[in-house]
Amino acid sequence: QFTDVDCSVSKECWSVCKDLFGVDRGKCMGKKCRCYQ
């Protein structure tokens, strides 16, 4: 899942992904958070 959340490192996305999608992991791609589903 792509998001509009800005990031610089993948760990910044983990709590974002948890809140948005209920998944614990994501990564930073192209300065935006992407969440695993």
Swiss-Prot record:
Pfam families: Toxin_2. Expressed by the venom gland. InterPro entries: Scorpion_toxin-like_sf (IPR036574), Scorpion_toxinS_K_inh (IPR001947). The record marks 27 as: Basic residue of the functional dyad. SUPFAM superfamilies: Scorpion toxin-like. The keyword Secreted applies. GO terms for cellular component: extracellular region. GO terms for molecular function: ion channel inhibitor activity; potassium channel regulator activity; toxin activity. Residues 26-33 are annotated as: Interaction with Ca(2+)-activated K(+) channels. Keywords: Calcium-activated potassium channel impairing toxin, Disulfide bond, Ion channel impairing toxin, Neurotoxin, Potassium channel impairing toxin, Pyrrolidone carboxylic acid, Secreted, Toxin. The record marks 36 as: Aromatic residue of the functional dyad. Its main location: secreted. Disulfide bonds join 7-28, 13-33, 17-35. It is found in: Secreted. It comes from the Eukaryota. Has the structural arrangement of an alpha-helix connected to antiparallel beta-sheets by disulfide bonds (CS-alpha/beta). Blocks selectively the high conductance calcium-activated (maxi-K) potassium channels (KCa1.1/KCNMA1). Belongs to the short scorpion toxin superfamily. Potassium channel inhibitor family. Alpha-KTx 01 subfamily. This is Potassium channel toxin alpha-KTx 1.3. It comes from Hottentotta tamulus.
